[in-house]
Amino acid sequence: MRGESATGVRPYIFLGFSLYETWKYLVLFLGSSLAHQVNYVVSLSTLVVSLAALLAFYPVIFREQSRIRLSAIAATVLLVASAALTASPLAEDAIALHVASGLASGIGTAVLDVLWISRLASCNQRQFLLFAACFIAAQSLLTYLLVSAPSDFPIYAFALPVLSCAMLWSTPEHKPFPTAPGKPPATWYGAAWGVF
């Protein structure tokens, strides 16, 4: 179909998800911790870098499948680095660390978004509904954790990107949700993606 990628996913879908993830990160993580003028700079920088990462990784992910795992690992490293910067005691007073954390999160999230959405290209309706339901549930849980216990969040920020990368690594490139024994079902994929 015209305007679609090699896997059948329209480009505007993952562009939209990237914008959503960037907005969510900025609202939940930076909205209450930075001054308005600094938050504006971080917001703009993260948005630009996220879109640039999507454009840069688009041909790599959809046309050179052998690099998917490398891309997932690189994105995970960026997200873990972002979590480390956010959890650092120095980040309380260092604007540069906040900016670096936002940029690392923007790039890592953008790449993982593209990777996950590429898995949805050939899933059936039941798999997609399971994925969507668990995505919403995981989003709700993460929001609750952020609001009720923000001091504990760095623990989740370190663990969840690694989990997501491991699940991407174990997935065959030609199947969005493997059904073979021992492979995680669509529910696990929805929950894993929902935390980003």
Regions found by a protein language model. Give the residues of each.
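Flexible interhelical linker loops that connect adjacent transmembrane helices
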Residues: 170-195
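Helix-loop boundary and gating motifs at the non-cytosolic
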Residues: 2-51
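Symmetry-related core transmembrane helices of the 12-TM Major Facilitator Superfamily/SLC fold
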Residues: 154-174
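Cytoplasmic helix-loop-helix junction between adjacent transmembrane helices
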Residues: 109-133
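Hydrophobic core of transmembrane alpha-helices in multi-pass small-molecule transporters
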Residues: 93-115
